[in-house]
Amino acid sequence: MYPRQKRIVDLVLATTVLVLLSPLLLLIVTAFGLDTLVVRRDRGPLLYAERRISRGREFSLLKFRTLREDVLMRAAGHARPYERDVANLTVAGRLLKRWYLDELPQLFNIVRGDMSFVGPRPWPPGLVEQQMRDGVDYRNHVVAGLTGAAQVTKGVPEARYAASDLDYVRELNTRRGWSVVAYDLRLMVRTLGVLARGQGLAD
């Protein structure tokens, strides 16, 4: 479930944003380098990848590393629960998480076609399998997104994420072509509002 028009907009927009944000990306790399130079426990790779599912296929989700490397090793491929504790974050990682900047490398995932700008957030294989055992399998049919309906509604409990995602899937089923793009753009504008308030987005 990935309309051609949606893919075209994703590719053009992701490429454009990468070019426009190249100074910011350079600044992040510089800040990360200074952090690892000054704070010994923050040392480690700039990027890390997690196994996630999009349209039933496994791919490597890219992120700027925000966790200390020793914590990341304990995370075993699912860092989100550890990111809630500020003590686990690097100095640079605290700023990246607040403004959602750790997700910027996923623009490359969008260019590659692993993800879209809008869709259910990609989950690790284990969580997708658990969701399928509960009788919910929409993640095997819909392309994952950088943001989605659940992420732009702050305060929604995690138990409601699936319901919000299913609302989005229903919209995809009832819309065609550019109508899907228009709906995505509305969610993207709402995402910018959340980011402007520095609230971060749920995974």
Whereabouts are the PLM-identified features?
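Short, glycine-rich, amphipathic interfacial segments at transmembrane boundaries or analogous
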Residues: G44-A87, T147-V169
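Short helix-coil transition/hinge motifs at the ends and kinks of transmembrane helices
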Residues: L37-D42, A76-H78, T174-R176
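Short, well-ordered beta-strand elements within core beta-sheets of diverse protein domains
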Residues: A92-W99, N173-R176
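Residue-level signal for cytosolic alpha-helical hairpin/rod architecture
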Residues: V12, L89-A92
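Juxtamembrane loop-helix boundary motifs flanking transmembrane segments in multi-pass membrane proteins
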Residues: M1-R4, R84-N88
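Hydrophobic structural segments characteristic of membrane proteins
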Residues: R52, P105-D203
